[in-house]
Amino acid sequence: MRHWYDQAIIYQIYPKSFQDSNSDGIGDLNGIRKRIPYLKELGINAVWLNPIFVSPQVDNGYDVSNYFAIDPKMGTMEDMDNLIKEMHEAGIHVIMDFVLNHTSDQHPWFQDAIKNPESIYRDYYIFAGENNQRPNNWGSFFGGSVWEKDPAGTGQFYFHLFDKRMPDLNWKNPEVRHAMTEIAKYWLEKGIDGLRLDTFIHIAKADLRQNFPVNSKDEEPVIAEPFFANLPQVQKWMRPFCEEIKQDYPDALLLGEAASANVNLAVDYTNKDNHLMDSVITFRYFTEDQSKIDPSFLNNYQPKPLDWVKFKQNQTIWQQTLSGISKPTLYWNNHDMARLATRIAKNDTQARSLAMLMYLQCGIPIIYYGEELGMRNLQFENVNDFQDDTVKEFVKSAEKAGVTSKEALLMASKTHKLPARGPMPWDNERNNGFTDKEPWIKGKKLDETNAADEIADDSSMFNFYKKLISLKKEQLFQDGNYYLWSTSDGSYVYERNLKDKKALIAVSLSQEPIEIEVGKEFSSERLSAGEYDLTAGKLRLEPYAGVVLEN
């Protein structure tokens, strides 16, 4: 059975940064509605909205305090109903971000749990320890311990894998599993077309009474990922959740965020026989070259180039292993990482070539808002703008090593996730048409691009992406087989074939011209970036150029 998402081309919208409609400096649902014609012009057929539920905004909406209502800063339920209706009228499906692993500490469940130790909601969360002693040495992804003292003064602690104001739900409790299923079904009944299942791989935890091995106490608390990521119970608990949704909404896309999952886990999570997800988003594609790191200070925000050899290996493993099982997601950037034009691409030509390379593989493209304009990260000039203590630690460490704070902030601006969430530039007016007030996010814009100019320029990045998306919709690039050519480290060449149709995607990863023997079979250009020459079966690519050739 074919589903709409088998041909999905998804555009990720970070609502706070897309379009402000009511002059408060924050993007909102009515702003997104205003830009539906733009999305239709680009050619995408689905949008993924980052969280829009009621939230204290400790983690930009990933801390939900009410799953059944729209955050007032985003708009109203009527606005959401209209957005769904108007997106559908434009032929665009709507995917919502659904946070399953944790809630806000302001959620009524948690508030009741800490006010009354006998509350039924106490078991909706993970409380452990006694006599003010933490149960183990596990560390939070946001720094410090995963354990925070129970505000009720019981001597216990509650578990939070992320910020201390985002307590983890206890998925061992069948009432929690039922409640989260009902929330998902509520939104699907409203007409949305799918859910991105945020951090679902963390819903199961190992025995809390064990410490993670460390060499010294100085290493504690420690990120004990084997104890809280991809455990077998994840599949056990997610299966009824997914089955119940698919029973009532068989055409709903279930897109799982499985950041640390390897390809074998991806097979488990998306194999139709397992009745789980339709596809997963992994962070395993992007192996970085660690050889350029300065060991004299913390490396978490030092820029690191992509290891292209490993990247080719990773892509091919995922393409080949998932073939016939599910479609992998194809992306270069999202709200949790620096932008393509900042992190990887050396120039406009390479950004275009890499887009061809990624999105014409077998899989579901996810294009991050503004990527189609060549948007870059903002530059933050104050450490507090990052809203992240780990950046403060990085800057202090760099200064001790003789790096100026200005240089350290520049590094962090190129690598941190928050500068990748800058306002969408629509035109040449104040704040590029995003808002007529001060935007919610501070930072210096480093590129001159805007949507109005890009649309008007036939040779622009926007119009390149428009052609690329149109090409991706063809059956060859949807259903064709994938075959990686054996070429030098300085190039990435693969073939898509379906019956008698073939396409060759050839991209230079080198700052020097390269030559590739492609034979005379591939002679017709479909799309290109940069300069190339094809003569007598020999393809010459100028630095970072790329081309799509067909037979």
Please describe what each predicted stretch is.
Residues M1-R2, N551:
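Basic/polar N-terminal segments that are highly enriched at the extreme N-terminus
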Residues R2-K185, E189, H202-N262, K272, ...:
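Acidic/aromatic-lined carbohydrate-recognition and catalytic surfaces
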Residues Y5-D6, S216-D218, I223-P226, K236-M238, ...:
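Loop/helix patches that line or flank the sugar-binding groove of alpha-linked glycan CAZymes
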Residues V47, L195-L197:
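Hydrophobic residues within beta-strands of alpha/beta enzymes
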Residues P513-A529:
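Beta-strand-rich binding/interaction modules
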Residues T535-N551:
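C-terminal beta-strand-rich structural cap/linker in extracellular carbohydrate-active enzymes
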